[in-house]
């Protein structure tokens, strides 16, 4: 009735340890069923974009595929995955700065990388190449043609904005392809500052 067509939900991490690291205890409530919550929203003809972060201190190789699998299990219509990005003035920035983990802090030049879509720090268990590869594998997994088709057909079957779902999924897929090129350029231009 309100005209809401979609919601953006920050699930943040597929693991309880990741949620604890982020202080999202709310997501750890016993018997919380995210799939049921997503379905309840979708029953009102509202699309769900799920958001996750890659680069947490507990994240290890394989986190990208884990995020894609969990997002699929939750039944989200689209997925937005971002790098853990310490922004100046936050506790995360202060902590990572004190640990010597901020790699891009030559402002104002480096502001262009603070979009949540570029790795601007050293991650504890993932190298620069590793964290970028996790992002790529996550998006490649979630936005494969077969998975997009499955989601769009599901939305068509359930009469939930299949055209918007298709356009949204193809847009994310297209952006992902652009980011693959941007990551290659980024590593060439800035990679030495991550050593």
Regions found by a protein language model. Name each.
Residues 81-83, 114:
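Residue-level detector of alpha-helical hydrophobic segments embedded in or interacting with membranes
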Residues 1-78, 94-99:
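Conserved non-cysteine loop/helix-boundary elements of the Radical SAM core domain that shape
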């Amino acid at each position: 009735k309100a005209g809401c067509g979609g919601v953006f939900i920050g699930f943040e991490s597929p693991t309880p340890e990741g949620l604890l690291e982020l202080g999202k205890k709310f997501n750890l409530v016993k018997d919380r069923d995210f799939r049921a919550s997503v379905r309840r929203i979708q029953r009102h003809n509202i699309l769900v974009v799920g958001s996750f972060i890659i680069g947490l201190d507990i994240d290890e190789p394989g986190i990208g595929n884990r995020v894609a699998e969990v997002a699929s299990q939750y039944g989200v219509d689209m997925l937005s995955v971002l790098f853990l990005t310490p922004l100046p003035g936050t506790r995360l920035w202060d902590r990572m700065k004190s640990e010597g983990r901020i790699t891009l802090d030559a402002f104002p030049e480096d502001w262009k990388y603070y979009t949540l879509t570029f790795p601007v720090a050293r991650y504890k268990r993932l190298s620069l190449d590793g964290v970028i590869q996790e992002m790529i594998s996550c998006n490649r997994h979630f936005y494969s043609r077969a998975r997009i088709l499955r989601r769009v057909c599901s939305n068509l079957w359930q009469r939930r904005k299949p055209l918007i779902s298709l356009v949204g999924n193809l847009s994310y897929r297209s952006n992902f392809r652009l980011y693959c090129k941007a990551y290659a350029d980024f590593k060439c231009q800035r990679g030495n500052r991550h050593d």
